[in-house]
């Protein structure tokens, strides 16, 4: 952004006290001159405006609930903030907000033809000076109703539909997180879209089909705290979609980093080049420090140039994204930046460092330039900086997906009448769930976990058993025994015992992984079923159980993340 001393920027700092006339002849005079802003600065302002509108919507929902639940006028006046509005109206005679003025000024900063011309380097260039006369769409009047604290920007009807965009989260600035990255088809390449999981895995696909203005009015939005608030309404729709300057900054792309989420072409870039980096673990702060030094011989993404940056993940944690800055027009960029990942030293052997290089597109989807994956269990920590060649991205097969840790358990089958006196009356299957080891959380921090057991094909809720919840532990000790009866030796050959690990949440639980114990024949009682998919290690444990009745059989099995859905 420009320095504080810039005269136009000084006007931005004085927004709350800026006089603004409401007469038709003075609408333009009250607006700000934002012609000096660069494209990146426009994007930053757009993010702030969207965040401001979102926070106002949350505040309106809070106030409406207070008005419906409180009867004391004095307490209601304090909690809703009406006292502040009265004090503000006595000091400031205007009713508009500074954000409304900036939004209206961005509307005015619009090319005469309403679009942008592409320069030789593929980026947008200014299409001309701002014009006021002869452009009715650039004139705007701002009316604010202070008691309701709602804003409305009045303007002409727009032909382009409103495209909602999620307010940016996190503190990373370059590159912008609302953009999407796609791998260009190249050598062994497939398309890969980058989506921001900030969204935490509990956050779901960030954007789906884009609604029209009429749909936006009728559709309620889900608040961050899980509650529903009224739809954004037409005034907010117009504020965010009232000009090409703002709507062009909205991103309707889906973000997500490790899977292909779009079928659009992103160019034809063949992966080549290499990356120089070094790794160091700091025990005092429990940090893995990845020093990204430089890249060399990168592919040109646009007209013999690339704007590269490096992104890192500490897999399988998809929330551990870190990024370097963007180096403009450089196929041999020098970064010399350190990316820090918080991780316990004992967890390093189960992690894989992913370093990927991307070309940043200002107006479109970022382009994949290559990646390297470094298994930390085999890394030489005494080595100096290392050059590794960039590789094309290949989607992993289900068998190659990592596990979430290990499950220690013991099994025992007690045939009917084997204990004397006709006991037990039917065959019993015993599970002793001891502990889970080296669990990998979905996001940094500990887990609240439990183990759930089902003996398929009986998947009824009544037949499920589970352990207690062990809180805040990545190596939880359960020491829990479960018993199922009614099984004969022939039944065990058709059955499959599924033990799954779950992350317990206040509203819902999430399955992290599991193991399936069976003979892995693919069929049960003559029917083909997908859940008979046991690995060789799981098959061996189940076969040993059948061969050694009345004995405890111990096993230490990986908690697989690639369990095939039952149905």
From Swiss-Prot:
Membrane topology, as annotated: Peripheral membrane protein
Amino acid composition bias (Acidic residues), ranges on this chain: 122-135, 170-184
Compositional bias annotation for Polar residues: 208-219
GO BP terms, alphabetized: exocytosis; intracellular protein transport; vesicle-mediated transport
Domain RabBD: 31-87
CDD domains membership: C2B_SLP_1-2-3-4
Cellular location(s): Endomembrane system; Cell membrane
Positions with biased composition (Low complexity): 235-255
GO MF, any single term: neurexin family protein binding
A Pfam family the protein falls into: C2
Modified residues (Phosphoserine): 120, 220
Protein name: Synaptotagmin-like protein 1
Organism the protein comes from: Mus musculus
């Amino acid at each position: 952004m420009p320095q504080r001393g810039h005269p136009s920027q000084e006007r931005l700092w004085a927004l709350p006290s800026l006089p603004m006339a409401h007469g038709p002849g003075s609408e333009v005079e009250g607006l700000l001159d934002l012609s000096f802003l660069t494209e990146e600065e426009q994007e930053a302002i757009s993010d702030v405006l969207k965040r401001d509108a979102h926070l106002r919507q949350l505040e309106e929902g809070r106030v409406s609930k207070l008005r419906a639940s409180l009867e004391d006028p004095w307490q209601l006046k304090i909690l809703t903030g009406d006292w502040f509005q009265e004090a503000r109206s006595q000091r400031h005679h205007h009713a508009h907000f500074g954000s409304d003025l900036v939004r209206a000024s961005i509307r005015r900063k619009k090319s005469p033809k309403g679009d942008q011309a592409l320069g030789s380097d593929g980026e947008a260039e200014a299409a001309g000076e701002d014009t006021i006369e002869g452009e009715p769409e650039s004139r705007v009047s701002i009316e604010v109703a202070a008691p309701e604290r709602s804003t409305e920007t009045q303007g002409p009807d727009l032909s382009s539909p409103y495209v909602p965009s999620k307010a940016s989260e996190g503190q990373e600035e370059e590159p912008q997180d609302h953009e999407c990255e796609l791998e260009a088809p190249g050598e062994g390449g497939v398309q890969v879209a980058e989506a921001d999981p900030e969204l935490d895995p509990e956050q779901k696909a960030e954007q789906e089909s884009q609604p029209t203005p009429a749909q936006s009015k009728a559709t309620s939005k889900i608040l961050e705290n899980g509650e529903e608030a009224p739809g954004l309404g037409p005034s907010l729709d117009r504020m965010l979609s009232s000009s090409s300057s703002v709507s062009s900054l909205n991103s309707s792309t889906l973000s997500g980093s490790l899977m292909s989420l779009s079928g659009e072409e992103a160019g034809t870039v063949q992966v080549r080049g290499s990356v120089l980096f070094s790794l160091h673990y700091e025990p005092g702060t429990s940090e893995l420090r990845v020093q990204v030094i430089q890249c060399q011989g990168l592919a040109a993404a646009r007209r013999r140039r690339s704007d590269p940056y490096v992104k890192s993940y500490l897999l399988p944690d998809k929330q551990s994204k870190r990024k370097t800055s963007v180096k403009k027009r450089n196929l041999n960029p020098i970064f010399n930046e350190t990316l820090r990942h918080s991780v316990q030293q004992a967890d390093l052997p189960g992690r894989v460092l992913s370093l990927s290089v991307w070309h940043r597109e200002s107006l479109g989807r970022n382009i994949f330039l290559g990646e390297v994956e470094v298994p930390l269990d085999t890394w030489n920590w005494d080595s100096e900086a290392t050059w590794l060649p960039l590789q094309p991205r290949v989607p992993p097969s289900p068998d190659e997906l990592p596990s979430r840790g290990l499950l220690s358990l013991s099994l025992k089958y007690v045939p009917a009448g084997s204990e004397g006196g006709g006991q037990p009356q039917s065959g019993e299957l015993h599970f002793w769930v001891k502990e889970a080891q080296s669990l990998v959380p979905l996001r940094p921090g500990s887990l609240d976990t439990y183990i759930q057991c089902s003996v398929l094909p009986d998947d009824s809720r009544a037949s499920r058993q589970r352990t207690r919840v062990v809180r805040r532990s990545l190596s939880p000790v359960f020491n829990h025994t479960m018993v199922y009866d009614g099984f004969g030796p022939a039944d065990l050959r058709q059955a499959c015992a599924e033990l799954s690990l779950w992350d317990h949440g206040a509203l819902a639980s999430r399955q992290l992984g599991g193991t399936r114990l069976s003979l892995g024949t693919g069929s049960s009682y003559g029917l083909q079923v997908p859940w008979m998919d046991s690995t060789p290690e799981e098959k061996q444990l189940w076969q040993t159980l059948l061969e050694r009745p009345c004995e405890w059989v111990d096993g230490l099995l990986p908690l697989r993340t690639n369990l095939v859905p039952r149905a």
